[in-house]
């Protein structure tokens, strides 16, 4: 089993390149950062704060592509991922260029974790109808894959429409950068994974014993091999029993959360988690 690290870094915290270098030095396999473009001030719509998440994590979130660019410059081995990027809120042509460039410069180490977002006001500020953001994300990703994989790409949809175009660089990974959908175990999320992604980031990681067979059933009915879908529990508890449980479910990649903060604090958390790396490496899937 491979272990990754995620941290909701802000401009008040240790820089992402410092964390990424420390993650790689301690033997972890990946480094992930989240995204919020902005946090609308709405008294009737407070942020969906969860345990261990600060308001500043939403208000002062770093741009994930820029943050991972700095991480790519100081690492050579670890995977680098967005967890998660709000794809509906981006121009897909620009995002395709950014992600392809990042995959090119990192020599194929990028995972694009995408989601649909909980903050409907944030989505509306980007001109996205929250009720239709699933459809927007699907079109954006399809258009991006065309730009990534075709010499002369074009896409004609409801939300994205462009004629034959050249766009380079192409990502190292083909036909697309590894793409995972983040979210709960709702049928709509699982259907989206099967339709246009390479796997699932189950936020929180609960209920997987029931959800994984459902996902695999949807994949089989759609003509996809369930073994081709990665399942990457995200922000999970750093617990050996939990990792053993995931291994028995056939999961071979887990992302642990550390609290963002000053460099000394974050590196101390990584030191405390580092013994899990060799332990996880001994876990075998059934």
Task: Cite the ranges covered by each PLM segment.
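Active-site-adjacent structural elements that line small-molecule/cofactor binding pockets in enzymes
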Residues: 1-286
């Amino acid at each position: 089993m491979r272990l990754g690290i995620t941290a909701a870094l802000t401009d008040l915290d240790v820089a992402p390149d410092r964390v990424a270098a420390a993650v790689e030095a301690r033997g972890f396999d990946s480094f992930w950062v989240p995204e919020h473009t902005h946090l609308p001030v709405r008294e009737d719509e407070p942020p969906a704060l969860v345990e261990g998440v600060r308001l500043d994590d939403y208000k002062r979130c770093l741009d994930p592509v820029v943050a991972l660019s700095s991480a790519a410059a100081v690492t050579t081995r670890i995977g680098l991922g967005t967890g998660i990027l709000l794809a509906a809120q981006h121009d897909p042509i620009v995002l395709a260029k950014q992600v392809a460039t990042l995959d090119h410069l990192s020599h194929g180490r990028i995972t694009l974790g995408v989601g649909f977002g909980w903050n409907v006001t944030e989505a509306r500020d980007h001109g996205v109808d929250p009720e239709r953001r699933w459809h927007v994300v699907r079109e954006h990703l399809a258009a991006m894959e065309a730009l990534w994989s075709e010499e002369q790409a074009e896409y004609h949809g409801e939300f994205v429409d462009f004629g034959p175009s050249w766009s380079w660089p192409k990502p190292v990974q083909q036909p697309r950068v590894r793409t995972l959908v983040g979210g709960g175990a709702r049928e709509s999320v699982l259907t989206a994974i099967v339709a246009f992604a390479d796997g699932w980031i189950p936020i929180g990681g609960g209920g997987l014993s029931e959800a994984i067979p459902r996902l695999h059933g949807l994949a089989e009915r759609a003509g996809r091999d369930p073994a081709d879908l990665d399942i990457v529990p995200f922000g999970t508890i750093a617990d050996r029993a939990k990792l053993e449980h995931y291994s028995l479910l056939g999961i071979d990649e887990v992302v642990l959360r550390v609290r963002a903060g000053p460099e000394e604090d974050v590196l101390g958390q990584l030191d405390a988690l580092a013994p899990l790396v060799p332990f996880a490496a001994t876990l075998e899937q059934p």
